[in-house]
Every structure is written in structure tokens, then in C-alpha cells.
């Protein structure tokens, strides 16, 4: 893993965009994208840039089950608001949270990923080490699946809703196996609340109890953290 420690989220987001921009200019065509507060500034940089996205395909990590695309808390809505309304992509894929047959749809999404191998995958990380909605205990070999959200994840996402009861209880998400198939991975984390997860991901044992720890086995991972998220790391990663 390559670890880049920046002073703050703004610098970290700029560094992440540099990696995506360079990758795209060097031929990357399929991008795995993420949602949430972590990548917002990255997407702002993307929108302000002159980067042409006409030939790009994007595949998003996840979507809440039961939210329509026009629901302001859906990840469809998030992506439209922060990127797709301003930059035209050749094709965009986001899991369908309103599908009537979730298991069949998950197989379809796996096929989409197989047909469009991801060149660069963007990730965040949860305080418990989850990536996408792959919670602790999720098998490393799993593909796209429906996941019941943990109480902690529901609480963490409640800030985006009027109250905790409105947070969906499950989501469709790419599995760890899908993520590991990406050619390159860029993971961003900011703030001291992420420090423990970052340390366990990079320095801890590879275990399904820390889903992100599997990234130690990937050949091309760049981790971008601010000084707060890096504070528990061994000094050798802070240079």
C-alpha cells in the first residue's frame, strides 16, 4: 500500500483527483465511484476541471434498498447532484434500490462489473473498517449482495436523514471480491474518528472482522489520509 498523508481534507481531495485525472489521461475508462461526505471535495475538483468524461463509464459501489432515485438521500441523487449533472459520462451504473428481485439483480450487477472491469476504484472507510456496506464479518469472496446495515452504520448515516427511523435498514452493494478485482484502488479517509480503522487496515492482521484489511493483498492501493486519520499509524507511513 502507498500511504499519502496530507494536512487536511482539501489537500487530500486534490491529491485524489490528481490520481484520477492522470489515470484517465493514461487510458482508464471505467471508474468505480463512491458516495458520502468523504469524496464531496474530490467531485467539486472534478466538476471545476476541464476533464472530458464523454468516454468514461462509472460503476457505483452501493445504494439503499427502498429509496427511489429522486429521493434526496439516495445515492442516485447524490451522484447526479455532485457529478453527473455537471459532467456527462458515456454510461453510469448505480444499484437499483427499488428492484423487486434483489438476488437476481445482484447477479446482474456482478455481470455489469465483469463486462466493464474497473480501472480505478474510489473507496472510503467506516469507523469499523467497512468498505462500501461490507460490514465486519462479510466474507471476502462475496460479490454484489444485499446487506442488512448494522446499528452503528445506521446511526452514522442518520445525520443525512430527518431522524434515525428514516434510515434504510439494508443496501445493495458491491462485494469485497468485486472491489479486489479493480486494477487500482484509491481510499480516502479524513478525521480522527477514522484513525483506528486506518491503523487496523494497514498494520493489522487480514481478517473479515476488518473488511478493509483485505486491501493489503491488492497490488495497487493508494491510501490518502489527513494527519488526524493518520495519527495512530507507525511513523514510517507518515513521511
Curated annotation (Swiss-Prot):
Keywords: Carbohydrate metabolism, Hydrolase
Pfam families membership: Glucosamine_iso
Catalytic residues of the enzyme: 62 (proton acceptor), 128 (for ring-opening step), 130 (proton acceptor), 135 (for ring-opening step)
Pathway stated in the Swiss-Prot or TrEMBL entry: Amino-sugar metabolism; N-acetylneuraminate degradation; D-fructose 6-phosphate from N-acetylneuraminate: step 5/5
GO molecular function: glucosamine-6-phosphate deaminase activity; identical protein binding
GO BP terms, alphabetized: carbohydrate metabolic process; glucosamine catabolic process; N-acetylglucosamine catabolic process; N-acetylneuraminate catabolic process
Keyword Hydrolase in record: yes
InterPro entries: Glc/Gal-6P_isomerase, Glucosamine6P_isomerase, Glucosamine6P_isomerase_CS, NagB/RpiA_transferase-like
Top EC class of this enzyme: hydrolase
EC number: 3.5.99.6
CDD domains given in the database record: GlcN6P_deaminase
Record's catalysed reaction(s): alpha-D-glucosamine 6-phosphate + H2O = beta-D-fructose 6-phosphate + NH4(+)
Gene3D superfamilies: 3.40.50.1360
GO cellular component, one term: cytoplasm
PROSITE patterns in the record: GLC_GALNAC_ISOMERASE (PS01161)
Entry's family note: Belongs to the glucosamine/galactosamine-6-phosphate isomerase family. NagB subfamily.
PANTHER family xref list: GLUCOSAMINE-6-PHOSPHATE ISOMERASE
HAMAP family: GlcN6P_deamin
Protein name as annotated: Glucosamine-6-phosphate deaminase
Record lineage: Bacteria, Bacillati, Bacillota, Bacilli, Lactobacillales
Amino acid at each position: 500500500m502507498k500511504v499519502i498523508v496530507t494536512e487536511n481534507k482539501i489537500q487530500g481531495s486534490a491529491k485524489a483527483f490528481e490520481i484520477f485525472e492522470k489515470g484517465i489521461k493514461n487510458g482508464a475508462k471505467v471508474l468505480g465511484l463512491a458516495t458520502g461526505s468523504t469524496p464531496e471535495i474530490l467531485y467539486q475538483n472534478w466538476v471545476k476541471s476541464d476533464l472530458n468524461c464523454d468516454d468514461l463509464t462509472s460503476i457505483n459501489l452501493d445504494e439503499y434498498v427502498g429509496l427511489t432515485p429522486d429521493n434526496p438521500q439516495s445515492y442516485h441523487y447524490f451522484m447526479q447532484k455532485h457529478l453527473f449533472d455537471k459532467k456527462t459520462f458515456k454510461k453510469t451504473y448505480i444499484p437499483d434500490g427499488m428492484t423487486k428481485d434483489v438476488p437476481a439483480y445482484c447477479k446482474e450487477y456482478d455481470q455489469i462489473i465483469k463486462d466493464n472491469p474497473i480501472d480505478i476504484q474510489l473507496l472510503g472507510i467506516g469507523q469499523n473498517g467497512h468498505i462500501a456496506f461490507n460490514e465486519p464479518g462479510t466474507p471476502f469472496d462475496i460479490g454484489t449482495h444485499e446487506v442488512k446495515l448494522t446499528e452503528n452504520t445506521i446511526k452514522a448515516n442518520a445525520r443525512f436523514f430527518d431522524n434515525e427511523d428514516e434510515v434504510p435498514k439494508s443496501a445493495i452493494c458491491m462485494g469485497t471480491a468485486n472491489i479486489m478485482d479493480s486494477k487500482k484502488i484509491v481510499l480516502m479517509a479524513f478525521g480522527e474518528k477514522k484513525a483506528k480503522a486506518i491503523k487496523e487496515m494497514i498494520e493489522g492482521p487480514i481478517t473479515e472482522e476488518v473488511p478493509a484489511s483485505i486491501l493489503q493483498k491488492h497490488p495497487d492501493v493508494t491510501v490518502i489520509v489527513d494527519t488526524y486519520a493518520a495519527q495512530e499509524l507507525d511513523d514510517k507511513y507518515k513521511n
